[in-house]
Amino acid sequence: MSSLNPSPNRPASALVTLNGVAARTPDGRGLFDNLTLAFGRERTAVVGRNGVGKTTLLRLVAGLSEPAEGSVTRIGSVGWLAQAQTPADDETIADTLGVAEPLAILHRVLAGDGSLDDMAEADWTLEERMQTALADVGLADLAPNRRTADLSGGEQTRLRLAGLKLAAPDLLVLDEPTNHLDAEARAMIADVVGDWPGGVVLVSHDRALLRRVDRIVELSSLGARVHGGGWDLYVERRDAERAAAERDLEQAERAIGRVQRETQMAQERQARRDRAGKAARANSSDPKILLDAQAQRAEESGARGQRLAERKRQAAEADLAQARERVERVRQLALSMPSTGLPAGRVVLNLNEAVVTIEGDRRLLGPLCLRLTGPERVAVVGPNGAGKTTLLKLIAGLIEPSSGSVERPVRAALLDQQAAMLQADETLVEGWLRLNPQGTPNAARAALARFLFRNVQADRRVGELSGGERLRAALACVMTGAQPPQLLVLDEPTNHLDIDAVEAVEAALSAYDGALVVVSHDADFIENLRVDRTLELKNGQLQPSTTP
């Protein structure tokens, strides 16, 4: 454990302090116990697997939830940006910014209708500060009486962030602030975090954002570990620990083998001594009492040796079990991808002057030309609303072009961030059999086991799964049939995943030997997939991306 601070759990001038805090889920399941942490004017990221309690920890910090045990102390103001918020139908821009009432007071005064109290309370710099905050998040000239619900999800996130800039809390708490945002909005969030004058506590799987923090809190069922530095330094230390865990496992396996051999040899020696002792006793002329005493001493000596050997064996087995547990925590997300058998020269996709229209004759996309050959990897980027999801549906064959043609001579599969091919009320076995109707229940269980849904896990219902589990289940269903798809189309697959799950998906897709078309705003994800080219969808046209 390390930190930039002399005491990583207690930074100087703490704004929020958690002392011996415990948290439970509504059904009583424990998330963490006896957690002691402090957050000051540094930038802190909280990482950990889905379900470990990251959002719960943020809510405790922000004062939105109370701990089951322990205490939370706050000094100064705290601002909260939730992962997803649905505005009321009549909520305006001014409401979301938190300035509706002071703005109304200012307008009454400016119109000459204000009371003496209005005159005293009027904030004469409010409109200027509001416009500056909106411009800072890319929403310049937004009318304060416009409905918030008319904005896109990404624009609403920007708007709430502008409200926080206006409020200027001492501590900013952000839960997955870059989810569903395009590259430009993600960069804006990262700049806000990097430049925030107070403290920041955030949960995110956006590795570019995690590089902007001063320390990382790794949350698990065992508690919290605090690491100084940003994401890259954290990964370096984590990977070193994982390599050490693998070495410890190898040593533990060798040690248990050595103890087993030594125990076997000791038992054989003792058996030989026992046989020799019995033979000597039978041929001895010594008094019986002396022979009995010698036999008892030999028996006690043998028993001591057996007890010592048993203690060694138990210690070695305990070390082995501990080493296996450490490694299993790392290995448990390793996925196995079957080969697609795609030849290098096979044409996988050919868009020839393809056009997609909506609402009658309004052109959304096209004319589009795109050719994929062999196991080529293509990333498609572009701002939200550009039509990327529609393009992927066209590529996967879920929609047809209004004009032009789409040639797709291989089997294709589309995986979106919701894993929509799966139905919430079906079990994983049922879903696999529905998507692979020629298969058997035994084949379904074997296939799901390759993707870590073993035994009773295969009987779980889709609606019970986390985002990462749903994507893993969808991969299992499409990749383990009789004919795995030779073209895999991915639409923002890393949304809703924790970082361990993202890295597991990256590793699995890196081993995929078919063609790949992926839409993602996660630059690290695209880089780790080692795509051959990146195309930008802009104004309905595909063109080489100028983004490095």
Name every feature range the model reports, one short phrase each.
Residues 90-95, 222-247, 537-548:
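Conserved beta-strand-loop-alpha-helix hinge in the C-terminal portion
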Residues 161, 189, 475, 494:
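Hydrophobic anchor residue at the start of the ABC signature
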Residues 87-153, 416-487, 492:
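ABC-family P-loop ATPase nucleotide-binding domains
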Residues 182-191, 495-507, 524:
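Conserved D-loop/post-Walker B switch-helix segment of ABC ATPase nucleotide-binding domains
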